[in-house]
Amino acid sequence: MTTIITVRKGGKVVMAGDGQVSLGQTVMKGNARKVRRIGKGEVVAGFAGATADAFTLLERLEKKLEQYPGQLMRAAVELAKDWRTDKYLRNLEAMMLVADKSITLAITGNGDVLEPEHGTTAIGSGGNFALAAALALMDTDKSAEEIARRALDIAADICVYTNHNVVVELLDAEG
């Protein structure tokens, strides 16, 4: 699997993810890019789970963003509806984090679209480790990017499905 984290702090939104791709107990690739910009660069998205499934969902989300420009929540809810009700999509095994300047969302195959209470959340095999580390660092003078990187480092030290090859995307946040 992998670990993806989003941190909002100091007028910035940071999404970061590691690069490990595993097949069973074997590391197949260490530098995959699981965090990227979509929707004309205004949205960052990260995924955990089956890679082909995640790319299918990212493509669907991009189409929803074209249909509902500037409305990440609406696009995410529409994607979640399709994901839950479509016979083909229902079998996809992935989870996504998406964020724009104003909102962060976790989208699951169960039809959940969850907005974290403080804009910081994580998914994947090391998600709980990364989230705990990030929350512990929020009251420090570290930037959003420093917190995200350190949280992923901690997760990679604990989770065998997460590595230290980190990709970061940064957006300016509202208010």
Curated annotation (Swiss-Prot):
CDD domains: protease_HslV. Allosterically activated by HslU binding. Its EC number is 3.4.25.2. InterPro entries: ATP-dep_Prtase_HsIV_su, Ntn_hydrolases_N, Proteasome_sua/b, Proteasome_suB-type. GO terms for molecular function: metal ion binding; threonine-type endopeptidase activity. It comes from the Bacteria. Coiled coil: none annotated. It is found in: Cytoplasm. GO terms for cellular component: HslUV protease complex; proteasome core complex. It catalyses: ATP-dependent cleavage of peptide bonds with broad specificity. The active site is at T2. The keyword Magnesium does not apply. A double ring-shaped homohexamer of HslV is capped on each side by a ring-shaped HslU homohexamer. The assembly of the HslU/HslV complex is dependent on binding of ATP. This is ATP-dependent protease subunit HslV. The lineage of its organism: Bacteria, Pseudomonadati, Pseudomonadota, Alphaproteobacteria, Hyphomicrobiales.
